[in-house]
């Protein structure tokens, strides 16, 4: 018997990331090849025509799993009974815009969306914030949805995780699929800290295999941190397809499990690893039965502490920058 359809809300539905994302969701890549989905697409009033065009293309693919599509500019319609909410739309930074202005503009969007999720979404809704600054936008949405469990709100660090995996595979000569136990700590920004001290490839320690502190410090960490900027420089456009792919990976693993493998998610801190409670911070997790669980008890050396504190300082600054815009 066919499963009942799951409702997947996607914001910024007329945008580039959504264009790479929606067809894969409709194809079963997000929730499984036997799980029908209803797409609930949100974008601004002036983008409704463009969303309709995307939906025409979705129709033309005749996806067996696509059980319905809703197009709206009202968050309460988009998030109604949503099982998954992918918050892709955000205010991009325009020329001459200060970071604090960007934070304020996004706080406005994510307080409204958090409140709408609070009011109408499934109580088990899995929320992934992709729109930047993703960690702080997720924090704002979480704080604006007091009736939903905090653990439902996550930010995307999977793109950083996947970028780090590919750099490690290239450096070590090992297949990317063989690399396990990679962690990426902190904010989805150039300050985040990709950490392969615990990583293995085909059972061997990557730290011993690579054995190059200078490469780690001067090449690996900055390359992963600045990869988005490098892609814009090369292509003239931001990394939309790889971001969409990372969003699929993040939610698929959260829903369907990781079989004990580590992945990175930005999740509300419980105070572990010296990160203040509620800060949405990238940590290694495993997923099982629709729940994520942080990897506990990892040793933090002096270099790692410095890196983790550096990215935390940025997150605290962002949090303080939006505090006056939040009710609680």
Curated annotation (Swiss-Prot):
Name a single GO biological process: tricarboxylic acid cycle
Task: List residues binding NAD(+).
Answer: 12-18, 106, 113, 130-132
Query: Which reaction is the catalytic activity of this chain?
Result: (S)-malate + NAD(+) = oxaloacetate + NADH + H(+)
Is Oxidoreductase one of the keywords UniProt gives this record? yes
Cross-referenced SUPFAM superfamilies: LDH C-terminal domain-like, NAD(P)-binding Rossmann-fold domains
Q: Name one GO molecular function term.
A: L-malate dehydrogenase (NAD+) activity
What keywords would UniProt list here? NAD, Oxidoreductase, Tricarboxylic acid cycle
Summary of the function given for this chain in its UniProt record: Catalyzes the reversible oxidation of malate to oxaloacetate.
Q: What is this protein called?
A: Malate dehydrogenase
- Source organism per entry reads Burkholderia cenocepacia (strain HI2424)
